[in-house]
Each structure stands twice: as C-alpha cells, then as structure tokens.
Amino acid sequence: MEELIIRNVTFQDLPQVVDIQVRGWQAAYRGIIDDDILDTLDKNEKLEKRKKDFDSNGFIVAELKNKVVGFCRYVDNDKHSIIVPGIDCELLALYVEPTLKHNGIGTKLFNYVVDEFKSKNKKSMILWCLKDNEPSKKFYTKMGGTIVSQKMFEVKGRSYPEVGFLYEL
C-alpha cells in the first residue's frame, strides 16, 4: 500500500467523510441495526453534523492517493462517557473505507489518537462499540481494550446495546 497520510480534516474532506460513514454503517451494521434505518441514512443530515464537528479539535482523516480513506473523532475529556469513572479521553468515531478494511488504516488512525492522548498526559481512554459488532470488537480487543461497561445507543427512536472498551494509556 502506498504511503498513508494522517492529517487534520479540512472542510473539503467532509463529503468524503460522510460517504465513508454512511457506507461504513451500511456494511458493518447490517443485521445489527434495523435495515429500514440503514437504508434511509441521510448523507445531507450527516454532513450538517460533521460541519458542526469541523471546528472542534480531534478530527483527523487518513488519506491515500489524495483520497480520504478513513477518519476519527476524539475528545480529551470525559463529557461523553460520564457513566464510567476515571475516564479522561474518548475515541468517539473510527471509520475506514469499507473496501479497504484489513489494510492497517484503522490501526494507524487508532495509534495516532492514542499518541495524541499520551502527549497530553491522558491516562484512560474509552470507546463505545455496538455489542453485536463482532469484527470491531475483535479489532478493539486486539488493540488492547477491555470491556468495562455497557449502555444503550439510540438511533431513530430505537435502542441498541453498546459496550465500552477501556484503554490504559
């Protein structure tokens, strides 16, 4: 694989980010999240949300051959995961172009985020994954995470169980 570049997101990246997110959901969550939800994901709605995220810290992309092939959102606080005590940072989202999975892109994005947190002296990172998403759970376990909690994830008025992976940095 040619050289992968990890960099901060630009406004021009957002349509590619949204495309990866929507197709990622449809590929990874089929059989986990109801089909009617997956089949009606609104890219414009997702784009508006990503535009709001754009100015925040912790929004990176993986670029290969001048094309966005993955992205991450992360925060160096515990505002999103107050149900787990002692957390001081969180990986909010990690997505890879579905046709390019198992090429090390997710690992490089993950490690970039961990290095960022370590440089800020963060100690305990959490990320949430749908409980029935076995491939992602396997990846997050391989990356050193331990399941420490469970909560419900709400989408379009329906609830799905998520598990929280803890990483001691």
Language-model segments: residues:
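C-terminal "cap" of GNAT-fold acetyltransferases
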Residues: 85-89, 123-126, 130-137, 141-169
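Active-site acidic-Proline motif in GNAT/NAT acetyltransferases
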Residues: 97-99, 103, 131-132
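Amphipathic alpha-helical recognition patches that constitute DNA-binding helices
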Residues: 16, 90, 104, 108, ...
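Extreme N-terminal starter segment of soluble prokaryotic enzymes
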Residues: 2-5
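Short coil/turn segments at alpha/beta junctions that flank glycine-rich nucleotide-binding fingerprints
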Residues: 103, 120-123
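Conserved acetyl-CoA-binding loop-helix of GNAT-fold acetyltransferases
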Residues: 102-115, 138-142
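Acetyl-CoA-dependent GNAT
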Residues: 8-14, 22-31, 38-99, 110-112, ...
